[in-house]
Amino acid sequence: MTADEVGKNSFAKKEEQVLKFWKDNQIFEKSLQNRQGKTLYSFYDGPPFATGLPHYGHLLASTIKDVVGRYATMDGYYVPRRFGWDCHGVPVEYEVEKSLSLTAPGAIEDFGIASFNEECRKIVFRYVHEWEYYINRIGRWVDFSSTWKTMDASFMESVWWVFQSLYNQGLVYEGTKVVPFSTALGTPLSNFEASQNYKEVDDPSLVVRMPLQNDSASLLVWTTTPWTLPSNMAIAVGETLVYVRIQDKKSGEQWILSQGCVSRWFSNPEEFVILESFSGKDLVGRTYEPPFTFFQSKREEGAFRVIAASFVEESEGTGVVHMAPAFGEGDFLVCKENHVPLVCPVDAHGSFTEEIPQYQGQYIKHADKEIIKFLKKEGRIFYHGTVKHRYPFCWRTDTPLIYKAVNSWFVAVEKIKDKMLRANSSIHWVPEHIQEGRFGKWLEGARDWAISRNRYWGTPIPIWKSADGEILVVGSIRELEELTGTQITDIHRHFIDDLNIVKDGKPFHRIPYVFDCWFDSGAMPYAQNHYPFENQKETEEAFPADFIAEGLDQTRGWFYTLTVISAILFDRPAFRNAIVNGIILAEDGNKMSKRLNNYPSPKYVLDTYGADALRLYLLHSVVVKAEDLRFSDKGIEGVLKQILLPLTNVLSFFNTYAELYGFDPKSQDIEPAYTEIDQWILSNLYSVVGKVRESMSQYHLNFAVEPFVTFIDDLTNWYIRRCRRRFWEAEDTPDRRAAFSTLYEVLTVFCKVIAPFVPFLAEDIYQKLKLEKEPESVHLCDFPQVEMDKILPDLEKRMHDIREIVGLGHSLRKEHKLKVRQPLANFYVVGSKDRLSLLKTFEGLIAEELNVKNVIFYEEAPSFIYTTVKPNFRMLGKKVGSKMKEVQKALSELPNNAIDKLIQEETWVLTIDDREIALDGDDVVICRHTDPGYIARSSALFSVILDCQLREPLIVEGIARELVNKINTMRRNQQLHVSDRIALRIKTTEAVHRAFLDYENYICEETLIIAYDFTQDSDFQGENWDINGHATQIEITVSSIDS
């Protein structure tokens, strides 16, 4: 396969064929059947909403989940993979509201809750076919035939059981708290929902005068929320902070603020004078005039006083804090402690109520300008500017959140914090830092969870309440049927809101709330199986899950809610192992945006490059380590061309010559006569098996991918290249049989190693190689075991050194524009005695690989190369100080052998004036110098020198090799079969003609020429080539002459 074919979507087309093979032959189903009765490997899948299309984040998560599931299955486990759907909540409601224009306050109630909920039910699976297409197309195996849905009555009933269990443990309560609130949705949100969508915004920055009663001074109060000023109830100071009374020299006006904030607001000391200083404690209890008079009657209840608060700081503002207890969590708690009254003149949609007649009906953020205008007119504004800061936005509507005091139902998470931390300590996180970092810190700061929502399409909270406050919590459908005497088939709001319970003659009515949809997903381990009403054994055996995987944002979402509920119910984690992936960004580093069109569509990528390339690109990146990835389809194309295409070419190479020479793996009865390079590639193969197994046991997917990516390079750029002629041998020799047997074993084992990661290509390779009685699919095979008897560490080390030496030689040729096809005379290798003694048996291999006539090994550098060492002044300055000149002189006088020894030992100790100075590699700059005609390069272990002086015999041989290259290029371009013999016509210079004749046998054997003709015919129209500076025309035709 050529690079041109990459553009023809050949990989994607092959993948479509593999998908059909899997479907037609029910390979996924068979993979499950084959492991029935084996050890269960439990996996929980985070449910997506089907009201939106899948994006790269979903494809990434699907890839991670699929890799682990496929690997565990091949490793002998039974891995059920059941898909689930998140059906409730704001994402669904919001779509219906938009489509039906139900945006005005009260519009849903006017439309009818029953009608609204049924509309929600209709659109839940709007994009289910697209989801199934992308999940299947990415190669993920999952069971869509028995999906669970959060809107199913069975699921919702289990959620009720979970809630009743929490309530019975005394961990559910009703209360008023300040919580994140979405005015677009008219409902409170949880702390973790509020943390998901912070943005940089510009807000007003106001310093407001608050005149003290019975005093000529005003307190200077800073705020970024002018809309909260009508609700001001108190002012807070820090008891231990020092405050100052400042007087303006010109106007005589006096202000009070904290001493540490003076320079922020008074930059010119010539314009003011500090009259006195005192502690914050001295201000506590003082009264002041609020900026608005709407709640003057509250003064009698304790409003408009200065109170102390521990959170008051001097890092920003004035050290004097405006308190609106209904709109700040800290304000609420401190005001409650100090018996300051609570007012909340803002409705559920963020508009001022009739309590603020001046701005009644205005949306609070829109009222900011009017409020500032009024306060300026009243002379209350000391400073007006803007401030840029991070502010939370609603994760669904993308509108600013507010913090608002609301009545809500809470789970007392703070009471079970120790249980959650204990559960977290037993989870294996990838990456590891999530445990003590992002997730652990979130658990340490966990707040009580507001679980009630003033919404409609969700699981109703099963609380019935009497007029005197008595509560009944229902835990099952049967229990509700018995309490109401009604047969129940659905428990959504419009089916049960009107069901009243009468107990001991007292009526109970259901509270009008539904659960936060995160409560649904947190109950998923139990609710997916309708636990505890059925499937008890299966659910308990599968708990905790062996594995889950989601994005970094879920450390404050699904990972968190799973942990809260499992810690309460069972005092255990909900999962044992978790992979946390990062965020996929557009190539420019911004969020992917349809509006900005800054990323290629998933369908385009899958249709152009295929799923394997996308999977490997993602798995071989930082995104599987919870870091962000800038997505680039060029990166996917690189994976295709540099990793998958070379492996496909190896398969094509093997099949071509195996078919040509009739290689039959079943007929290989005796142990092949393996050469050292055969033993090396097999050793390398089984080392890779071990590395992949070890990495997968730790859930390090990127580490699992790395060794097999490197192995593909070893296989294609070393083993195949070094052994090509062995496969071309016309005679059936033991050496040819060993080469075929080796490569057959490599491909049949390696396709199983890569099967979890690139399942399509693995299947393609397997199908082209599998024997009749072997499993039907590579995914029905066992994952390879490590064959320790084939692992030869010393041989791998030696070959690594050889490749390093050859790599240095190739780098020299490339740097100095010396084609490898041009033979050179000598290649020198300088290294330690121990290493060189193991490499001398590979002298011929190095010579052939680098196209040199002689390879010479030296333990010390030869006379035509010398090394100098200079100080790295930037690094050495701190270490040697005034001794720099002496160090520079000592380094310049070191002889070659001493320098080589120091390089190998990687330690440098110089004695300057009886003082020992220890240097390391960063402290010096090593420079290699050679005589004219030689070029050199070094690594940590070796130095190599290439004799690049061209003599006549070498020039002639270079021409011959160039001819071979160009003729074989023409063979490939004309798509000749590897066995086709050809006739050659050539028009060229005398030098090329002479080189051809000198190397006739070599050229004819390498290109399968059986007849040739040199012509000077002026009408000859061959293909034009430059043969080392000689203009040449060449024509080749398939010859009919029997070879």
From Swiss-Prot:
Location of this chain's protein in the cell: Cytoplasm
GO MF: aminoacyl-tRNA deacylase activity; ATP binding; isoleucine-tRNA ligase activity; tRNA binding; zinc ion binding
One GO BP annotation of this record: isoleucyl-tRNA aminoacylation
Superkingdom as given in the UniProt entry: Bacteria
EC supergroup of this enzyme: ligase
One Pfam family recorded for the sequence: DUF5915
Cofactor(s) it depends on: Zn(2+)
GO CC annotation terms, alphabetical: cytoplasm
InterPro entries: aa-tRNA-synth_I_CS, aa-tRNA-synth_Ia, Anticodon_Ile_ABEc, Ile-tRNA-ligase, Ile-tRNA-ligase_type2, M/V/L/I-tRNA-synth_anticd-bd, Rossmann-like_a/b/a_fold, tRNAsynth_Ia_anticodon-bd
Keywords of this entry: Aminoacyl-tRNA synthetase, ATP-binding, Cytoplasm, Ligase, Metal-binding, Nucleotide-binding, Protein biosynthesis, Zinc
Motif, 'KMSKS' region: chain positions: 591-595
Reactions this protein catalyses: tRNA(Ile) + L-isoleucine + ATP = L-isoleucyl-tRNA(Ile) + AMP + diphosphate
Broad class of the protein's primary localization: cytoplasm
EC number(s) stated in the UniProt entry for this protein: 6.1.1.5
HAMAP family: Ile_tRNA_synth_type2
Entry text on domains: IleRS has two distinct active sites: one for aminoacylation and one for editing. The misactivated valine is translocated from the active site to the editing site, which sterically excludes the correctly activated isoleucine. The single editing site contains two valyl binding pockets, one specific for each substrate (Val-AMP or Val-tRNA(Ile)).
Family statement: Belongs to the class-I aminoacyl-tRNA synthetase family. IleS type 2 subfamily.
Protein name per UniProt: Isoleucine--tRNA ligase
